[in-house]
């Protein structure tokens, strides 16, 4: 368990079984048996999943700068052993050219363990007790029992335009869909928009740095709205992420994306966060539908809601 915000925890679970049936949007019930109320459980949406498998890495083992003679009477090629001997004998570099020899080896490390990651907003009970046991910059290990998965994976990849509105730890629902899209080369989705409102920029930095591929896809737009920023220069977000220092105008954003899509194509809107976030997203979706009602072949808008009340 690590602290990623003033009251936000990142809980990493290493399941004993390799396949736990993870899918974007899945949630699990977590039990912490080292507490007095060990029978208590809380549902949390998984923010990411890494399957078990081999951990094979290939990296340069040695980098050797070889000096080779360039005189007309000298051979143009030589073996690596000869080059190494020349370097070790400290021969003069005059009339020699430099080549780089890179020797790579594949090393087999310990097998990669399956891993589930959860983002938890500490409030009362179990989550508060975890928060009180952690100090900034440190982590703790606790036993954990996992029950799940529950929930339904939405058919997000089948929509040409996807807009996800997230508030706080509600980004747990958005991240698996975002990672799924970034890891897919051929897809139907031509525009993927994530609008995330979060109190602390440092929290956004810690969470988004684990998302690979941000800033390299023109079809992906990530907008982060910092609502309580004190030290703007103390954190950095990945390249390509747009930052605003205010609350997002959720209704306007949804209507804008609905108008900008290709006419006649469907659009998916997912809201994940507290009551204020989902209320605004629902209202914006209705207004976008009403705005498009008079247009012929405007395309449908599908709305899904993942409320966060814990």
What are these language model-derived features?
Residues 1, 183, 286-290:
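Transmembrane-helix exit/juxtamembrane "anchor" motif
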Residues 1-9:
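Canonical alpha-helical transmembrane segment with a positive-inside/aromatic-interface signature
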Residues 5, 16-19, 165-168, 188, ...:
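Intrinsic disorder
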Residues 10-162, 226-229, 288-309:
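FAD-binding FR-type
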Residues 21-32, 145-148, 166, 170, ...:
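ABC-type nucleotide-binding domain
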Residues 85, 95, 109-113, 118, ...:
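Reductase modules of NAD(P)H-dependent flavoproteins
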Residues 156-180:
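MIDAS-like acidic motif and immediate structural context at the N-terminus
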Residues 171-195:
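Classical protein tyrosine phosphatase
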């Amino acid at each position: 368990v690590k602290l990623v915000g003033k009251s936000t925890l990142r809980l990493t679970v290493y399941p004993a079984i390799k396949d736990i049936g993870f899918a974007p949007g899945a949630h699990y019930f977590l039990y912490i048996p080292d507490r007095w109320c060990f029978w208590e459980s809380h549902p949390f949406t998984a923010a990411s999943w890494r399957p078990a498998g081999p951990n094979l890495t290939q990296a340069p083992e040695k980098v050797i700068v070889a000096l080779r003679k360039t005189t007309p009477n000298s051979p143009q090629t030589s073996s690596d052993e000869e080059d190494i001997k020349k370097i070790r004998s400290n021969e003069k570099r005059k009339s020699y050219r430099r080549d780089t020899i890179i020797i790579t080896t594949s090393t087999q490390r310990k097998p990669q363990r399956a891993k589930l990651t959860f983002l938890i907003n500490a409030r009362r009970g179990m989550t508060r007790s975890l928060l009180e046991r952690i100090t900034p910059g440190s982590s703790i290990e606790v036993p954990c029992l996992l029950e799940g998965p529950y929930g339904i994976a939405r058919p997000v990849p089948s929509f040409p335009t996807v807009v996800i509105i997230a508030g706080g730890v509600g980004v747990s629902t958005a991240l698996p869909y975002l990672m799924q899209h970034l890891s897919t080369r051929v897809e139907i989705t031509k525009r993927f928009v994530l609008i995330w409102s979060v109190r602390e920029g440092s929290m956004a930095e810690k969470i988004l740095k684990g998302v690979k591929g941000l800033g390299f896809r023109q079809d992906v737009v990530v907008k982060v709205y910092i609502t309580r920023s004190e030290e703007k220069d103390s954190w950095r977000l990945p390249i390509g992420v747009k930052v605003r220092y205010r609350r997002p105008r959720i209704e306007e954003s949804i209507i804008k994306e609905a108008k900008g899509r290709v006419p006649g194509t469907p659009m998916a809107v997912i809201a994940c966060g507290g009551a204020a976030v989902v209320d605004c997203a629902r209202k914006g979706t209705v207004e976008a539908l009403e705005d498009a009602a008079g247009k012929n072949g405007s395309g449908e808008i599908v709305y899904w809601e993942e409320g966060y009340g814990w």
